[in-house]
């Protein structure tokens, strides 16, 4: 009926208390540093959990989440566990120490200026591109090795033959053949919207659905 309201309750058995070990900051394809909260392993809904999303830098800073903090976490289905409540804050928030960073104008996130100059950023962006295209066996580890072998851009990897792929450490003929086959298959099947979204060259506010809508409305967008 029109007056009905759908809502989901969090049951007590899907909530646990955990101790924070620290915060890992992952560099996104847009140069933002996103927090992952590492915790002492706990059982939650029959699964051992050792980390949870930290949402954003403001959440970490405002709640002083760092080593020793006590938090309540929950998990629903296959969704990444998240923090419900901070029971005991740390002495100080665990903000990034290994990179120079700045706050965004909104004061919610932090980002790395000139992230394009950082190898970690380039590997993340390349990995994301192939993940969006559905290339299953091109992990960040593989991309890292290809990068070190001089295949340090998306075009270079797409164009690389078997011999070139095998110049990467640990990439033997069978692995190279699998990578080459999967990339060829993905490129032949992908849509323009997938390429645009996966490239990471556009605003982070533009998602896959928005790109699909743009390409549908403007099928010749690349030649305009």
Regions picked out by a protein language model, each given a short descriptive name:
Residues 1-196, 205, 213-214, 220-223:
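RNA/tRNA-interacting regions in translation and RNA-turnover enzymes
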């Amino acid at each position: 009926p029109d007056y009905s309201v759908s809502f989901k309750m969090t049951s007590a058995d899907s909530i646990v208390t955990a101790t924070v070990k620290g915060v890992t900051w992952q560099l996104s394809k847009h140069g933002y540093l996103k927090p992952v909260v590492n915790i002492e392993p706990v059982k939650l809904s029959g699964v051992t959990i050792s980390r949870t999303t930290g949402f954003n830098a403001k959440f970490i800073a405002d709640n002083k989440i760092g080593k020793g903090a006590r938090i309540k976490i929950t998990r629903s289905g296959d969704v990444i566990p998240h923090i419900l409540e901070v029971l005991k804050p740390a002495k100080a928030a665990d903000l990034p120490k290994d990179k120079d960073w700045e706050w965004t104008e909104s004061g919610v996130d932090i980002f790395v200026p000139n992230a394009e100059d950082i190898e970690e950023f380039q590997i993340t962006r390349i990995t994301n591109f192939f993940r969006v295209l559905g290339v299953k066996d091109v992990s960040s580890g593989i991309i890292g090795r290809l990068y070190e072998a001089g295949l340090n851009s998306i075009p270079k990897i797409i164009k690389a033959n078997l011999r070139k792929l095998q110049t990467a450490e640990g990439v033997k003929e069978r692995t190279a053949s699998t990578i080459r086959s999967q990339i060829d298959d993905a490129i032949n099947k992908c849509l323009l919207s997938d390429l645009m979204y996966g490239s990471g060259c556009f605003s982070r506010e533009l998602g896959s659905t928005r790109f699909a809508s743009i390409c549908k409305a403007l099928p010749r967008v690349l030649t305009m």
